Amino acid sequence: MTLAVNKKERAGVINPIFTCQPAGAEYATIGVKDCIPLVHGGQGCSMFVRLIFAQHLKENFDIASSSLHEASAVFGGMPRIEEGVKTLVARYPDLRLIPIITTCSTETIGDDVEGTINKVNKFLKKEYPNREVKLIPVHTPSYRGSQVTGYDAGVTSLITNLAKKGEPNGKLNIITGWVNPGDVTEVKHILSEMGVDANILLDTETFNAPTMPDKNSFTFGNTTIEDIAGSANAIGTIALCKYEGGNAAKFLQEQFDVPAIVGPTPIGIKNTDAWLQNIKKLTGKPIPESLVVERGKAIDSLADLAHMYFANKRVAIYGDPDLVIGLAEFCLEVELEPVLLLLGDDNQAASKDPRLAELAKRANHAEYDIDVIWNADLWELESRVKEKGDIDLILGHSKGRYIAIDNKIPMVRVGFPTFDRAGLWKNPVIGYRGAEWLGDAIANAMFADMEYKHDREWILNVW
């Protein structure tokens, strides 16, 4: 059969899959220690993003706003940047980095962010001679792209402005992309097992924050400014997600001769194998027996489920391109049929991704078609469910849950945001243990659906 890639036919958006660029840049920059991003736009551009971060991660984050109002939209909002930076520096004595994140309104009126940064830097040098607070621009016009584009812009801006050539440090850069804290923990685990000294860009493991006796309720990233500066001196860079850090990896290669490997996103057995081989290639470190055992456990667990429960089940997947394509590849490994892939970003490059060509080759040997829609929204999913009724399982974030509920289709929550199930951000989807968790989560969702519908639930008696 075939794989067809098409753009959403409607000009409008009904029930969007994603939010806008600034949200992605905000998620990237809060992964840096001693950093508070300043969102140059209306107050909602930070308030509602903080809300959705809190819903997903159940933590609080410091994200400032220049609180642009009507007068600033007419006369220019540069003074709001100045006031915002001065307030942050005065109130946070440990603050070392302030990314200035633009929005649709400030990009439209053409505020000179770089010029304002130069002006404020002179003020800071005079008023705070013993402090060094770096200001960097992050341009995220939210009338194009999505949170994926914004995350990539955020990481790229951090590295282009802070990376500094020095002595080789022997570290391996890992640009994680927009992943959960549980995924970062899994990345660190695998690197530790291989004995690799790594530079995690960006380390959000600390978003799984404890409640301490001092009642500190705010959460901070764990990547330091020095870590970002040292990325120029690494032995190599691996970007786990092509569209969420791939440009930063290419910049390090072009500007500082740091070898870069972009992808594949290590979801599933095959992609994790490739990731480990890439680590071995760049570092020379062997793959230890402990990871071979983890791989074997994952394969054993998935083999128990694949043919008996997963075979011929048709799956719809939506989310960011790297996650969706990675999940589709995983589905093929376990005999699930990914018949509908919805890429929420309007980046046309995703529609020409080489990984889709590989999926097309596999589709040629299958008995089903794979429909890929880029710049998609959740109405595409709802229409497919109602018109064809051929979806047995949905993989995606919580925004699509009502489609699953209304049409009585089992659903596994993956991606961002997931707020109607507890603790999912703690669980990895990458690596061998992530593959094992995905298999278990899919199976349990299907088992519960069988029980509620009284559909062959007797099979579970011997499970």
UniProtKB/Swiss-Prot annotation:
Pfam families on file: Oxidored_nitro
Origin: domain of life: Bacteria
Gene3D superfamilies: Nitrogenase molybdenum iron protein domain, Nitrogenase Molybdenum-iron Protein, subunit B, domain 4
Cofactor note: Binds 1 [8Fe-7S] cluster per heterodimer.
Cofactor annotation: [8Fe-7S] cluster
One cellular component term from this protein's GO annotations in UniProt: vanadium-iron nitrogenase complex
Catalyzed reactions per annotation: N2 + 8 reduced [2Fe-2S]-[ferredoxin] + 16 ATP + 16 H2O = H2 + 8 oxidized [2Fe-2S]-[ferredoxin] + 2 NH4(+) + 16 ADP + 16 phosphate + 6 H(+)
SUPFAM superfamilies referenced in this protein's UniProt entry, alphabetically: Helical backbone' metal receptor
Residues involved in [8Fe-7S] cluster binding: C20, C45, C104, S142
Alphabetically ordered keywords of this record: ATP-binding, Iron, Iron-sulfur, Metal-binding, Nitrogen fixation, Nucleotide-binding, Oxidoreductase
A GO MF term: nitrogenase activity
GO process terms (BP): nitrogen fixation
Family as reported in the entry's similarity comment: Belongs to the NifD/NifK/NifE/NifN family.
Task performed by this protein: This vanadium-iron protein is part of the nitrogenase complex that catalyzes the key enzymatic reactions in nitrogen fixation.
Protein's recorded name: Nitrogenase vanadium-iron protein beta chain
Protein's gene: vnfK
